[in-house]
């Protein structure tokens, strides 16, 4: 009767099917295939069940359709029931099509053990079945098993991997972040003659990019004759991920010159590059491009624009984009709130968080709470900290170790080490971040001994190992407390026992540690021996130490190098001016001041905030508009006199140098 050809839709087919008094197996199969084409999986299983009630036995055409429906609906129990039916029939049990469909069903339901068992029962699995198994392991979070199964496939004499199998294999290598394995697969691809398959080559490019094989990715990209938008976007992302944002923007310009139209992924990568390079001009051009292509309304693009403008220090433009987002998600709020804090506007971060809760009914996630607690830390208001702590407990975030660490840091910044310690003790699973937060808190308040006790307790009484950040915190704590011998011991411990390579920040703290006690010669020697060129931060620390210990000759040497690296930093000129002033070299003081004026260098406006009785008071240097300026300046003069008296009574101590 031409049942299959007569009806183009499953609705017509079902209507006609329902009017039949007697149905053949062919008609049942036709109906199920029609429903499958339209992805009406529930209907497939519903009619499959009715087929049994009509005592119509399914065949090797019926069962694969039903098993596909089970896989799509993750109905593993139903699928196992069908598997039981198949086992009772020798003909169906040996059918490759039915066996492959059972494997597909188990893979879709995440049951790889059953899928593997079923695969091993097949007499001669074809390339599709082999590829399904490789894909199944890769998609179910077992990339290593996917690679091992591919090895088994290659060893089989009766099957040859195709491009689909290889793309899946490359995806597994990408998830493993194994560039060495990626290179092996790349060689296999070339030997098998797939080197001109653009989809496969793009997958390899993505593998190299995400495995930090930067040179291999760039070289492969250059070898692609006909690059598409995926090729360009992948290599742009690779440059960004490897800290080469400026180069990423140059590649994007090459892409535009090549005539390749960017897509959403390209725009997102370029915006990340603009943010990392702080390239506001290119960011604005990319924004215009997004508007022309109608992409600005997509929440991912809008959020990336907010992030870019914030990191390019243009919060006004960031907020303008944010206000136009029709449906703001929690990621958008994270970009806005963290962006305001980055731009020194932590108070705006708190305000926007309140607006989010009251007006937008958006519930924050753990990431947003960490950002908000960070904003609160910048302000250092204790009462506000307690309010946020209550919010954290109310919404069940207190068990999150990252939020716990943020609370420890928050209370420390607010001067409440007691509350910081209570939060720390209440965290059941303390990781490195939590331990480091408490050590940092003690260090901020000059409690170096307590910081050392906490560090030693961490090392001896827990399974948590200190990382680079932990060592930076404990070194800073030792520096602030003048614990020179302990600081040097910690530095050696990091290098010799934990085999951690010090970075520039570690060396900066080490120089500060030596500079505070006047061991300037050793500090200079450290800057010469370290595997990095001295940064302005390190040289500025040295210059400050030279001023404190009145070493004018060394100060001039350091300042010369410092001004070459950063010639527009007002603070460094002030330091050198103070050195000359102490020596009575007023001509040099005048020369420096004239140089600052000629360069148009201005010192940033100093500002202080203090919270008293839940009210925030803001003080600005040389402020003549404060309503209580007279008592404020009177108190400052009185404090200044007390500080001078204390300074005169200070006891200085000598330090006997320790070798590194």
Curated annotation (Swiss-Prot):
Keywords: Repeat. The keyword Acetylation does not apply. The lineage of its organism: Eukaryota, Viridiplantae, Streptophyta, Embryophyta, Tracheophyta. GO terms for molecular function: RNA binding. Belongs to the PPR family. PCMP-E subfamily. InterPro entries: E_motif, Pentatricopeptide_rpt, PPR_At4g14850-like_plant, TPR-like_helical_dom_sf. PANTHER family: PENTATRICOPEPTIDE REPEAT-CONTAINING PROTEIN, PENTATRICOPEPTIDE REPEAT-CONTAINING PROTEIN-RELATED. GO terms for biological process: RNA modification. PPR repeats lie at residues 24-58, 59-89, 95-125, 126-161, 162-196, 197-227, 228-262, 263-297, 298-328, 329-364, 365-399, 400-430, 431-466, 467-497, 503-533. Transmembrane segments: none annotated. Residues 538-613 are annotated as: Type E motif. This is Putative pentatricopeptide repeat-containing protein At3g01580. The keyword Repeat applies. Residues 614-644 are annotated as: Type E(+) motif.
